[in-house]
Amino acid sequence: MAVIGGEPMNNNEYFINGKEKSKWSNIRQEINLKSETAKSKGALALIIFDEYLHRRYSYRYKYSDSGRGGKRMELGNEESNNFQVLLFSENHKEYLSNDNLKFNMNFKKDVQTFSADNVAAIFRGSEFPDEYVILTAHLDHVGIQNGDIYNGADDNGSGTVAMLEIAEAFALAKEQGHTPKRSIVFLHVTAEERGLLGSEYYADYDPLVPINKTIANLNMDMMGRADPNRGIKNLNYVYVIGSDILSDDLHEINLEANEKFANLELDFRYNDINDPNQFYYRSDHYHFVKNNIPSIFYFSGVHEDYHKPTDTAEKILYEPYKRRVKLIFHTAWGLANRDERIKLN
């Protein structure tokens, strides 16, 4: 079965919901929905033609083929033998215009299995201990290549160390008689560099706490440097990605925490599901978002040492980094200590 990405347009409106996209053209949902529907109707195979997804996946595969990110991996499950993606030219209309289209595919798949651990701790809340705020940071990097150690100080030492500092701050607060109302899960996820696998496993297959009791996710990934694209202007900034996409409450709590405690410039330039850089889909918060959990990805930007041995600790900018960690702590506290659970949009 061949299907087109998105949904039909009718007089410049979406076919199902008019001005708004439906789930059938939502990048977080459409592939699974269309695959499941095709399977239920007896389809043996599915080919999806989608220009937008081509741009997204072609970047991913070019990066993988460069050798900097390693080979693609996926979780071992019943769908592991599926193609993840089949790339055609972006101009796929030529394929669809031929009523007698035929093509042949030959492929060989070399499958290897490995295991890796997520590492978690739970800080119990005082009044609503069965509701959870999850903090995430990936603990892996790209290892040793051609004898060079890839240190990963920013990617993602900055996120893992931030989480440990925040965990210590919660523990100290409890010692002083201050415990937030909800519980906090500190989750170091594995295999982010191999395709967000640790967070996918947690969110989709084996969560420690119920997904429907998880009120928000705050994700820390590459937050210790400065983006050269910003020039030499204010270094006391952080990119905030996803804060208002699922919950305006989450967005407002983050703004308030920043105003009171961190005084950072909150830069929302990448807070767009259609941004060509696709940062919204490229870190571990994404697997929480697709499960309808409001999430923020805190990020300071890509730099010249990204996935190189030169990503070392002395290049971390500790003053803005400290402010970013402070912002995340107070946002987590604000989420956990509210009288009411934050609302979805």
Language-model segments: residues:
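His/Asp/Glu-rich mid-to-C-terminal helical/loop segments that flank catalytic regions of hydrolases
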Residues: 86-87, 168, 299-345
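Short helix-loop-beta-strand segments that form the rim/entrance of peptidase-like active sites
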Residues: 168-195, 220
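Structural recognition of the beta-strand scaffold that forms the well-ordered cores
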Residues: 1-4, 44-49, 84-87, 120, ...
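Second-shell loop/turn segments in exported
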Residues: 15-29, 33-35, 81-86, 106-110, ...
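Metal-dependent peptidase/peptidase-like ectodomains
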Residues: 128, 189-297
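Soluble metallo-hydrolase cores and metallopeptidase-like ectodomains found primarily
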Residues: 72-152, 168, 172-176
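Extracellular/luminal Protease-associated
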Residues: 1-76
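Active-site metal-coordination/substrate-binding segment of hydrolases
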Residues: 1-2, 15-26, 134-172
